[in-house]
Amino acid sequence: MQSRSLGVAVIGAGMVGRSHAAGYRSATTVYGAGLPPVRLVAVADLNAAFAEETARRFGYERFETSWQAVAAADDIDVVSVAVANPLHREISEALLAAGKHVLCEKPLAPSVADAEAMVAAAAKTPDLQACVGFTFRRSPAIAAVREWVETDVIGSPIHLDGFYRCDYAADPDGPMSWRYRGGIGSGALADIGSHLIDLGEFLCGPIASVRGATLATVINERALPAGAVVGHAKSELSDVREPVENEDIAILIALFESGATATLSASRVAFGRANSLGFELFGSRGTAAFDLERPGELQVTNADVLGSTAGRRTVPIGPAHPYLTGGMPMDFPGVGYGQNDLFVFQARAFLEQVVGLKGLPEVPPFATGLHNMRIQGAVVESAARQGAQVDL
């Protein structure tokens, strides 16, 4: 594999698709040599203008207006799928059947049954990478907290208090889109709560059960847009209104196999919090707190600091922490990083998997996405049963 180049494509030219396109563009510039030449071949989107602009902006050779063109292309080996969730299964299965390595955005599918089918399709192509993108695993700060758990810096997890607060849906005049369709559980829970669930297990181990779930919708209908919309952008509205089919807020309690607990809340109507993921992890020997709005630091308290200097302190993230050494043009303390860089780290890790390198932690397989979907399903069941405990 390393004797030949890799052709890369991205399906979806929206907000997340652009992040994947940019990630591949920079992937060969981090962590030294090792990858074969990477060709940025195509960006595909039904909206030709979006596809063309994204391809031009990030240096891809061409744009396409159908995912089928990507699947049929002989010069493409690796594909990111960054489109509406209901399309993930059809596109990913077709790409695997066409011999492409696939990195699919989360949530893996719109239902557990669809996710199971995707895992089965991946099993039929064992020589191909079929992965799901839980990008926050690539955060140097979050990965550092995981290391602190594993090395007993903060001890064994006792309780995780996590949140993901966004306001992309806070405006009732925001246009209707696929994000507001699909039934209960496909809204804030699937869109951003899936990240929280994955991070909970990333830091605390497997979830054994969920309870106390609440799923709430506070904006019950929206107007259809008068034109095309990218990501969470505003647009002119038509006179046609449709009901919102899924939840704006998701809240749950998770119980881990280790005995640890978590309270997790996700909201897409948190006015003033554009993109705020955070947590406080309480361990047997200390505590670590993170907020995506200040991604280059952690708040830490641990039992190794006693007496008059004990207490909460700020730890700046730098070369001593995961991903940064070799992963940034200026990889020394105080430079900082952001969420866009996580897509670069993820793209590099995925390309390494494709060619069989073992440098970075692997991008999780479809099976991890299915597992996450099953936990989401348990949350929906708990909410439907007035917060009853649902075992996994």
List each model region and its residues.
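Alpha-helix termini
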Residues: 27-35, 125, 152, 356-358
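Conserved SAM-binding strand-loop segment of SAM-dependent methyltransferases
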Residues: 61-67
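Beta-strand-loop-alpha-helix segment that lines the small-molecule cofactor/substrate pocket
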Residues: 78, 84-137, 152
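Predominantly a Rossmann-like dinucleotide-binding segment in NAD(P)-dependent oxidoreductases
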Residues: 16, 128, 136-244, 298, ...
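Conserved acidic residues
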Residues: 41, 61, 75-77
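Glycine-rich phosphate/pyrophosphate-binding beta-alpha loops
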Residues: 194, 265-274, 338
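N-terminal Rossmann-like dinucleotide-binding module
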Residues: 1-58
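C-terminal glycine/acidic-rich active-site capping loop/insertion
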Residues: 219-247, 251, 255-258, 285-363, ...
